[in-house]
Regions:
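Bacterial N-terminal signal peptides
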Residues: 1-10
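Short, glycine-/small- and polar/acidic-enriched structural segments
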Residues: 15-168, 172-179, 198-200, 205-206
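Sec-exported extracytoplasmic/periplasmic mature domains
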Residues: 40, 67-71, 86-89, 143-147, ...
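Surface-exposed patches in mature extracellular/periplasmic domains of secreted proteins
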Residues: 54, 93-95, 154, 240-251, ...
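Periplasmic-binding protein-like
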Residues: 99-109, 191-218, 222, 230, ...
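Short, surface-exposed acidic
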Residues: 149-153, 192-195, 257-269, 306-314
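Secondary-structure end/capping motifs
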Residues: 220-303
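Conserved C-terminal helix/tail region of periplasmic/extracytoplasmic solute-binding proteins
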Residues: 293-330
Length: 330
């Protein structure tokens, strides 16, 4: 009788499902496939977590949601998190998993405007969206590549006109995500052979990209649920890598009238350039190397004055990561 009661209680505890409010940094597109698959293929459910998913209006909004307790976990730019954490009133939100080992920041330019490599940016006009972190890292990249920042004319734009202005030739280049703006421009009719994507990571930028961030109260109260979310995310990444073409079908079901070819290209670009990097192949997905993090902080400091320079432990908590073997990506 007692054994039966214990077994029943144990089974009930084991089956307890934790709800997680998850926020992407923007509307779903092809690059979100690992998270979409984790939901649609039951990977979250297998981990005894019930995940609700919505979208923020950029990384700063995603961080705000997590800090305010409106979301438990979110995908956000770790560089935006670093800047946020330097605020005196910052909630101690931390990243627990790096999704983009290389940040997708890039200069997207047209060859017909005389730009084929990063050095050609000097003397040109670059369209910049207010708050775009790509340009906040520009001083460090310019210095590394011998470019005089004061010789680059900055034109401030709204997000809605970034691609149209480059398409119309009103600016020579725009800053943005490599797998967003470049593919969007092709969709606007700009010939692929006239576009050049200058990824800042290819020109010396050391910063990491997007990461999963967690509300500190939720992390303290539900550590096993956070670990379960990371395991399901890794499973979603692996399933996506196995067959990107199949994965994109699940994404398209969540979008309205999107182009299959463009979203598949977006997914493949994010995989090749940002997720499956040489560092990830060596060490597995999700972690941070202390030496590279320190170098990234140095580069951020070229355009940002820290009140107090953070330590790696201030920004990233590796305690929720699965063992390295479980994070290996083939």
């Amino acid at each position: 009788m007692l054994i039966a009661l214990w077994l029943g209680a144990h089974a009930t505890a084991a089956a307890t499902v934790t709800t997680i409010r998850f926020s992407l940094d923007r509307a779903i597109d092809g690059a979100a496939a690992p998270f979409v698959l984790a939901a649609s293929k039951g990977l979250f459910r297998t981990e005894n977590i019930n995940v609700t998913m919505d979208s923020a209006a950029g990384s700063q909004d995603a961080i705000r949601r997590v800090a305010a307790g409106e979301a438990d976990i979110a995908l956000a730019d770790i560089n935006a998190l670093i800047r946020y954490r330097d605020r005196e009133d910052a909630v101690p939100v931390k990243a627990v998993f790096v999704f983009y080992d290389k940040a997708p920041y890039a200069m997207i330019a047209r060859k017909s405007r005389g730009i084929v490599t990063m050095a050609d940016i000097q003397g040109k006009t670059v369209g910049l969206v207010e708050g775009d972190l790509a340009m906040r890292l520009w001083p460090a990249v310019a210095k590394l590549n011998g470019i005089k920042s004061d010789k680059v004319k900055i034109e401030k734009l709204s997000p809605a006109v970034r691609e149209p202005m480059l398409s119309a030739g009103q600016v020579d280049a725009v800053s943005g995500f490599s797998f967003l703006s470049a593919i969007n421009l092709r969709n606007r009719g700009v010939p692929a052979n006239d576009l050049v994507v200058l990824r800042l990571a290819d020109f010396g930028s050391e910063v990491y990209g997007h990461a999963l961030i967690v509300n500190p109260t939720f992390a303290a109260n539900h550590p096993d649920a956070v670990k379960a979310f990371l395991r399901a995310t890794i499973a979603g990444v692996k399933l996506t890598l196995k067959d990107p073409s199949k994965a994109i079908d699940d994404v398209l079901a969540k979008m309205d009238g999107a182009s299959r070819d463009l979203e598949l290209e977006r997914l493949r670009a994010s995989i090749a350039d940002n997720i499956v990097t040489d560092e990830v192949k060596r060490n597995g997905i999700g972690g941070i190397e202390a030496k590279r993090f320190a170098a990234a902080l140095d580069q951020i400091a070229d355009d940002f004055e820290f009140r107090q320079r953070p330590s790696l432990a201030d920004i990233f908590d590796e305690g929720f990561l699965p063992a390295a073997g479980a994070r290996k990506i083939n």
